[in-house]
Amino acid sequence: MLPPKNFFPSLIIFHLFPLHSPITFFGLIDAPFGRFSRKVSRLNLNGNLSWAIMELVSPIAFLTTIVNSSRPSLNRPSRILSGLYLAHYAHRAIISPLILSPKRSPLHITVVLAAMLFNLLNGYLLAVGLAFYPPKEIGWQFVLGVIGWTIGFFGNVYHDEILNDLRRPPTKRIVMSHLPEDGASEKERYKVPRGGLFEWISFPNYLCEWLEWACWSFAANPYPLIAVPALPYLLRAPEYRDSHTVLSIISNFYWPSRLLAPSWAFVLAEVTSMLPRAVRGHAWYKEKFGNKYPKSRNAVIPGIL
């Protein structure tokens, strides 16, 4: 059974997402949120609420696609991975921004709209991937992937809460009971994070999230590439009858024989998006705190980068 007619064109477009990475890496543009937010702008939105809204797009797109899929039902491994995916977004879209997180920096509307578009496409692709390219069985690769996902997920949550504790009063801290006042007064927003992998890198929450989704992808698709049917075959398929124009336009540029599975395309998109921001953020930390910032601390990979 072929996946939905929009799947391959959408996946090809999703592969183009990493092309934006050099723009951020070389500092041409910093996405206006967090430490790089524009403090005064009419296009700024409430940080906590807008974060929740843009992140909810992904699980909504995921569930909508699963419910409307032409596949009768997901197999057991795919149901487990769906549960892990939804657990991540329950925390990321609801628990973290609306319950746990202190007041966040404002989000520029361009960030929110771009994230909503990305999450819409990603949720759709991951759902189709689990439905039409499911893991075959619960073998050692699947179990190892789920264990790795669990470590990455809780590592991500733990280090996020260390950052949140920097903005909480002492009586409301969740992870750290005592924090050194490195280079900042109580009135300043940013302080030097300590604890966990922060002793070695500036962005352990990023590293843990990469581990989380790489292991999820390993459980879903141990072999990262999926075969793409030849274009003449797709054009003859009844379910693709209404998409001839779109397929023909794309084929004028490139029609691959293989593509990254949606889960691995997501990992690539995450790393290429977050790595430049980690490097830029690490430089920002060193500039702001000077000699008070640990010289041995790397940006995102201990001892390497």
Q: Where are the regions that the model predicts?
A:
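Eukaryotic endomembrane system proteins
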Residues: L98-V143, T150
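Membrane-helix and juxtamembrane interface regions of eukaryotic multi-pass membrane proteins
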Residues: M1-L117, L305
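Hydrophobic transmembrane alpha-helices
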Residues: M1-T24, F62-I66, L74-N75, F118, ...
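Juxtamembrane membrane-interface segments at transmembrane alpha-helix termini
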Residues: I94-L98, Y124-L125, V157-Y158, R277-R280
